Swiss-Prot record:
Its EC number is 3.2.2.22. GO terms for molecular function: rRNA N-glycosylase activity; toxin activity. One of its GO terms (biological process) is defense response. It comes from Saponaria officinalis. Ribosome-inactivating protein of type 1, inhibits protein synthesis in animal cells. Useful as immunotoxin for pharmacological applications. The gene is SAP3. This is Ribosome-inactivating protein saporin-3. It catalyses: Endohydrolysis of the N-glycosidic bond at one specific adenosine on the 28S rRNA.
Length: 236
């Protein structure tokens, strides 16, 4: 919402809740189109659409985040009979467990990031029989390359710098991802003219200038800080 300015900055802010709860992103690869469904209010990925090995459109979704009826509206190519609620939840830990990552610390960091990697994993889930490990790995990379890249210019810049190649992720990327809500609340409730009232440490060193966080998008926390800002300041 261009009218929302948090902490005296020009960082974009997600608009207030509306009747349009979801948005759709379409990706093209050598095997065709794969679509993602995201929640507008926080950019959480709630579903994806791909063809199976019989070229039938199928939609897979997190049942706690979107209903079958909402999914039909968002991804109408898949009939209700061809919708499937995923057996795991939308949090990173659950997806990582199903991705069966055996390297290093066994988290998404070990997979890396990059456009070529995203394209490879799209091809692994499109026009093929469903394999949960491939699906979970696709979701891990797709979430980071869409929602997380929108939230953090730091991640955007890494993608651009290495485009289109795969690159190794890093601890700082993970710390950004798990602290989006906390960072948004700190900027909303405890920053003025782009400067925090105290030093903050979000897992990668102390920060006083908001610009040093290289944010791309903040979560919606209200239109006017006032009492709400006091509440968020107290939480931090």
């Amino acid at each position: 919402d261009p009218n929302l300015k948090y902490g005296g900055t020009d960082i974009a802010v997600i608009g207030p809740p509306s009747r349009d709860k979801f948005l759709r992103l379409n990706f093209q690869s050598s095997r065709g189109t794969v679509s993602l469904g995201l929640k507008r209010e926080n950019l959480y990925v709630v579903a994806y659409l791909a063809m199976d090995n019989a070229n039938v459109n199928r939609a897979y979704y997190f049942g706690t985040e979107i209903t079958s009826a909402e999914l039909t509206t968002l991804l109408p190519e898949a009939t209700v009979a061809n919708q499937k609620a995923l057996e795991y939840t939308e949090d990173y830990q659950s997806i990582e467990k199903n991705a069966k990552i055996t390297e290093g610390d066994k988290t998404r960091k070990e997979l890396g990031l990059g456009i070529n990697l995203l394209s490879t994993l799209m091809d692994a889930v499109n026009k093929k029989a469903r394999v949960v490990k491939n699906e979970a790995r696709f979701l891990l990379i797709a979430i980071q390359m869409t929602a997380e890249a929108a939230r953090f210019r730091y991640i955007q810049n890494l993608v651009t710098k290495n485009f289109p190649n795969k690159f190794n992720s890093e601890d700082k990327v993970i710390q950004f991802q798990v602290n989006w809500s906390k960072i948004s609340k700190a900027i909303y409730g405890d920053a003025k003219n782009g400067v925090f009232n105290k030093d903050y440490d979000f897992g990668f060193g102390k920060v006083r200038q908001v610009k040093d966080l290289q944010m791309g998008l903040l979560m919606y926390l209200g239109t006017t800080p006032n009492n709400a800002a006091d509440r968020y300041r107290a939480e931090l």
